[in-house]
Regions:
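Short glycine-rich or small-residue beta-strand-to-loop segments that form or flank ligand, phosphate
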Residues: 50-53
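Short polar catalytic/cofactor-binding loops
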Residues: 9-13
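Acyl-thioester C-C bond-transforming condensing/cleaving domain
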Residues: 1-2, 15-46, 61-119
């Protein structure tokens, strides 16, 4: 099955210790997921899987991708994983999603990356 991108969203770009300092990576990821799902015209329960790249994972708690997904309204039954591959995490996540869709394992996925360089 071919894989297509139906929505693309990014979070604001900030400066270290500036306006976004109070936002965790999972909170920023949730904003992007919520908007991507809305712009794609799907309901939050439609994705089969959430896979997000996230490099600076120390201190973020367990599976920040799952935290972001739940905060974005994705049901708890939808699995989520965080990938850590320095400077390539979001592309690795998108590649993983693409491979799973082309293999026929999944139909709809949320894939991308999230980061907070301040906290």
């Amino acid at each position: 099955m071919p894989s297509v991108i139906v929505s693309a969203v990014r979070t604001p770009v900030g400066k270290f210790g500036s306006a976004l300092r109070g936002c965790s990576a999972a909170e920023l990821g949730a904003v992007a997921i919520r908007q991507a799902v809305a712009r794609a015209g799907i309901v939050p329960a439609e994705p089969d899987y959430v896979v997000l790249g996230h490099v600076l994972q120390a201190g973020t708690g367990q599976v920040a991708a799952r935290q972001a997904a739940i905060a974005a309204g994705i049901p708890r039954e939808v699995p989520a994983i965080s990938l850590n591959n320095v400077c390539l995490s979001s592309l690795a996540a998108i590649g993983y999603a693409d491979a799973m869709i082309r293999a026929g394992e999944l139909r709809t996925e949320v894939a991308g990356g999230m980061e907070s360089m301040t906290n």
